[in-house]
Amino acid sequence: MNCSAFSFWFVCKIIFFFLSFHIQISIANPRENFLKCFSKHIPNNVANPKLVYTQHDQLYMSILNSTIQNLRFISDTTPKPLVIVTPSNNSHIQATILCSKKVGLQIRTRSGGHDAEGMSYISQVPFVVVDLRNMHSIKIDVHSQTAWVEAGATLGEVYYWINEKNENLSFPGGYCPTVGVGGHFSGGGYGALMRNYGLAADNIIDAHLVNVDGKVLDRKSMGEDLFWAIRGGGGENFGIIAAWKIKLVAVPSKSTIFSVKKNMEIHGLVKLFNKWQNIAYKYDKDLVLMTHFITKNITDNHGKNKTTVHGYFSSIFHGGVDSLVDLMNKSFPELGIKKTDCKEFSWIDTTIFYSGVVNFNTANFKKEILLDRSAGKKTAFSIKLDYVKKPIPETAMVKILEKLYEEDVGAGMYVLYPYGGIMEEISESAIPFPHRAGIMYELWYTASWEKQEDNEKHINWVRSVYNFTTPYVSQNPRLAYLNYRDLDLGKTNHASPNNYTQARIWGEKYFGKNFNRLVKVKTKVDPNNFFRNEQSIPPLPPHHH
């Protein structure tokens, strides 16, 4: 080899070495690259409190775990984000998106941390969590009966501050006060006012979304297709929701509730259930009559301990005690509702009563409990949901209730929630959430437990009940609800050329005929599929546009 050839070879080797070294450094340090990029966009100064946490920070684990609502996912084996960003304004979200794109990190956006599969804070590839805890302002305009709510606010905060302004206004969101509005509203969001006003997503009139290019869009600038998609189609598919503008609704000055327990042999419970399933969805929209079933240990007349299934029938009625008792005695005398079973509450106290964070027997609760983000007991849990379109036969319901005995006492529960009311009148394509006319009720199966080592046992029980009920629920497709996300329905391999075909399997369960429109919106606004997870809407490949 002559000198010039050797020199060329040596220079090439040096260049190759440095290139390789640089590539390895950039791959090895996406966290450092992200931090450098972020600090260029958002200079760290005195006016700027700490926004970014890495695993080197003392507060990293407490911030990560603080809003993990499902204790299944607090474990050493759960994948952890390289970075947690806690933005306090839109510019911080913009910087996070641009820098994550630049260095090749995925984003998970967390509002309240209630995602049933933990997908607002878990990813199988290197990722950043955008934790919206510091973006929780609520600006209410009583005159126009609207409010701007930042996506990190909780339902409890929304209900509390609306009530502070006007006791006869509220918003039709869910029951649990610690749920964040970012995910809840963008997945649909049902609750006590659903039969009067529809879902939370039906009552959104504007939004601020930060898109894949880091631009902040409102309803006008994003256009009606994207605005349609984020109200029930999962905002995380299209960007990061920073705020919602919501339409407030009228609520009565008093409402009446009861929650009666029925402890009898299963055939007797099934008779009550059968009456319930044939009448609850037909009631006037001012009455919600829900039911749930759970096992409990009791002592029988002979002093022996035994496990029985208990049924609970619970109401929310827009009106007084006398009217409700009269209605129940005429329409459902088998329940035997008496005046002494009922309580009249203000609307805000009704909200608290059914919040799951106070004792049912406690009458002296303060509405400030709605502001407590740590209210309620956290457990590990698993949940699956079905929609029922025709009555479940009594013989089948006997067997379904008997399956509660296969689970630990008090660990498994079925909740049945009536549809009907205004839900019958809203088009299935009004927003991506399609489950409207023809749905009698939703039925969900859940298990909760304490110990990590019991995860598989309880998850498998929920799966077994879900499999058993297959013939009795909606079919072709078997419908599902995005806010009770279920990865058993299928996952999408975004590297696969068949990702649309894979996604359609679960997509049509969540969205019905609306799935294809969601795909078109995704293809238009995020063609390179930056915002993705195991169950995200895929864009069509370029040749299909």
UniProtKB/Swiss-Prot annotation:
Q: Which residues form the signal peptide?
A: 1-28
Listed under GO cellular component are: apoplast
Task: Give the result of H292A, as annotated.
Answer: Strongly reduced catalytic activity
Sequence positions that bind FAD: 109-115, 120, 176, 180-184, 190, 236, 241, 481-483
In UniProt terms, what is the effect of altering Y417F? Answer: Reduced catalytic activity
- Active site annotated at which positions? Y484
pH dependence (UniProt free text) = Optimum pH is 5.5-6.0.
**In the UniProt annotation, what is the result of changing E442Q?**
Slightly reduced catalytic activity
Q: Please write the reaction equations for the catalytic activity of this protein.
A: cannabigerolate + O2 = Delta(9)-tetrahydrocannabinolate + H2O2
**Cysteine pairings via disulfide bonds:** C37-C99
Task: Kindly list the cofactors needed.
Answer: FAD
Key word Manganese present: no
Tell me which EC number(s) this protein carries.
1.21.3.7
GO terms for biological process, alphabetical? cannabinoid biosynthetic process; terpenoid biosynthetic process
At the top level, the lineage of the source is: Eukaryota
The entry's stated outcome for I63L is:
In strain: 001
For this UniProt record, the keywords arranged alphabetically read as follows: Apoplast, Disulfide bond, FAD, Flavoprotein, Glycoprotein, Oxidoreductase, Secreted, Signal
Give me the glycosylation sites of this protein.
N65, N89, N168, N297, N305, N329, N467, N499
Residues covered by the FAD-binding PCMH-type domain: 77-251
What does this chain do?
Oxidoreductase involved in the biosynthesis of cannabinoids-related terpenophenolic natural products, which have pharmacological activity. Catalyzes the oxidative cyclization of the monoterpene moiety in cannabigerolic acid (CBGA), producing delta(9)-tetrahydrocannabinolate (THCA), the major cannabioid in drug-type Cannabis plants. Can also use cannabinerolic acid as substrate, but not cannabigerol or cannabinerol.
Subunit organization: Monomer.
What protein does this entry describe? Answer: Tetrahydrocannabinolic acid synthase
Q: Which gene encodes it?
A: THCAS
